[in-house]
């Protein structure tokens, strides 16, 4: 005869109560993210950190099932499904690696201004990417970057500096055919450009992106001076940026070019911009072939996957995370193949 609740050890009842409480809180947090998206500080931060607070549900489901606790199982089911949807592809990818040989290696890296120069040097030395999409390249540092890396990447393009003083860049071992300013971006967005490369006779359009930075927990005065405004407005800017880049990728793809959109989204899996980009036909390379969570923001293991490589007209082969050096982001390296 199974023990009644009164007969169960106190520690067991306590653990069960904690598990149920976690499940209820995680379910409510998930509802907040899905309903409010990135529209306020709470929902944005919950979406950003979701990989961590959803993960315990994957462990609690089998434990609750083994213990025969229906209440615990019911409480943790929703967060477990969400966690499985996020982590499941990486498990599947481990058992079904892509067999194709890569034709091109692309990397993206938010250098945190000059702080990440050692990480950039390691990335270039150890991984030898053909194309680099870089963020937070201060105008004052460009000459130093060119002096140090120009011999390896003779073709380089820099965006105009944003109001925050930083800019994006595309470095390439392949010739640059054209550079076009991205128009139609919302107010508060950083400048962006489409850099078209000639890769062994094929056209490749590359966009290095750095979506609007959030103004988390900042004062009204600080929000007024932030280029994208307060948290809610910055969220709207990021979504509009994502839609514009997605439309741009569709236009370039329709013109016969392969497309790479890579950079720092300031958003994670449950935040809206990444969903927006993927819903318009761009393939998230890490989700397609990655085998680990790839939490690139913050020191390893990081707290969120905000740095991504998305492609159209190219097939993902492999992806990995590089060493950050002094940056607050880890680089993402993507091996790609031309369609057969």
Predicted regions and their residues:
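Membrane-proximal, lumen/periplasm-facing interface regions of secretory-pathway glyco-
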Residues: 100-102, 213, 219-224
């Amino acid at each position: 005869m199974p023990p009644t609740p009164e007969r169960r050890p106190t520690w067991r009842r306590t653990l069960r109560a904690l598990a149920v409480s976690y499940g209820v809180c995680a379910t409510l947090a998930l509802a907040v993210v899905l309903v409010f998206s990135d529209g306020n500080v709470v929902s944005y931060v919950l979406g950003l950190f979701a990989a961590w607070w959803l993960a315990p549900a994957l462990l609690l489901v089998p434990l609750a099932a083994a213990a025969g606790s229906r209440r615990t199982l019911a409480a943790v089911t929703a967060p477990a499904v969400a966690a499985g949807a996020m982590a499941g592809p990486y498990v599947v990818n481990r058992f079904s690696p892509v067999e194709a040989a890569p034709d091109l290696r692309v990397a993206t890296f938010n250098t945190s201004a000059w702080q990440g120069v050692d990480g950039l040097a390691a990335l270039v030395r150890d991984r030898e990417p053909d194309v680099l999409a870089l963020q937070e390249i201060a105008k004052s540092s460009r000459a130093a970057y060119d002096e140090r890396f120009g011999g390896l990447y003779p073709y380089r393009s820099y965006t105009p500096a944003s109001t925050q003083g930083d800019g994006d860049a595309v470095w390439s071992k392949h010739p640059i055919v054209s550079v076009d300013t991205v128009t139609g971006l919302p107010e508060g967005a950083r400048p962006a450009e489409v850099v078209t490369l000639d890769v062994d006779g094929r056209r490749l359009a590359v966009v290095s992106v750095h979506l609007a930075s959030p103004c988390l927990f900042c004062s009204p005065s600080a929000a007024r001076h932030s280029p994208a405004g307060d948290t809610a407005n910055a969220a709207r800017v990021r979504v509009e940026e994502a839609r514009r880049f997605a439309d741009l990728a569709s236009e370039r793809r329709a013109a016969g070019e392969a497309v790479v959109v890579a950079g720092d989204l300031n958003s994670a899996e449950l935040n809206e911009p990444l969903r927006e980009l993927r819903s318009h036909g761009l393939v998230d390379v890490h989700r397609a072939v990655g085998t680990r969570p790839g939490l690139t923001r913050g020191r390893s293991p990081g707290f969120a996957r905000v740095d991504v490589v998305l492609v159209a007209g190219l097939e993902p082969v492999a992806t990995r995370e590089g060493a950050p050096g002094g940056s607050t982001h880890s680089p993402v390296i993507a091996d790609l193949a031309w369609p057969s």
